[in-house]
Amino acid sequence: MNAELGSIAIGVHPVHPLHLRWYAGIHVYFGFMQDPKKEFMREAIRLSMENVESGKGGPFGAVIVKDGVIIARGANEVTSTNDPTAHAEVVAIRKACKELGSFQLDDCEIYCSCEPCPMCLGAIYWARPKAIWYANTKSDAAAIDFDDQFIYEEIERPIGERKLFTHQLLREEALVAIEQWKTTTKKIAY
C-alpha cells in the first residue's frame, strides 16, 4: 500500500530506490512522484534490465498497479524455470491474482517493458485490467530474435493451413463437458 503524506510517500512497494529509506519495517519515499505512470514503467524496465544481468530469462519485465500501488512484479522466467509460459506479464498476472484473491484484475493497469506477445496479450485480456502500458515495441523485440509475427500470421490462417499440425478429434465426447458447464450450479462465471 502507498499513502501520500505531503512530500512523503509511504509504501511497502518500492518504486524509486534512490529516494528510499527503511523505517520500522516499511519503505519511506522522500519526495513527490513526478509522474506515477512513468515511475511504474521505469520499474518494469528496471526488472527487464535486472533479468538480463541475472541471466534468468529474456529482457522483459512487468508490474501490475491497483489504486496507484504496485501489487505485483514479474520478469521473464522462461529459461530459468523451463516454462515457455513464464513471460513477465504472465508471471505478474499470476502474482497479482494471488495477491487480490481473484482471477480478474479489475481496476488494475499493467506496465510492460515491451509490447506483449500474442500469448501475453491473450492472458491480459482474460485478466481484464483497465489498461496496458508498454515501452519497447514488438519490432524492437523482433530485432533481438523475439519475433512473434509468425504467431500473429498463424492465428489468421484457417486451421488446415497452419504450420503446426492441428486436427479436431472426439468432439462429440468432449461436448459432454460443455453441456455439463451449461447446467452446473458449481461454476463461477467469467
Regions found by a protein language model. Give the residues of each.
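Short hydrophobic alpha-helix segments
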Residues: 72-74
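Zinc-dependent deaminase
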Residues: 28-53, 116, 123-190
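Short beta-strand scaffold segments in enzyme catalytic cores
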Residues: 59-65
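A short acidic/small-residue loop/turn micro-motif
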Residues: 78-80
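Intrinsically disordered, low-complexity proline-rich regions
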Residues: 4, 9-20, 27-30
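Helix-adjacent hinge/juxtasegments
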Residues: 82-127
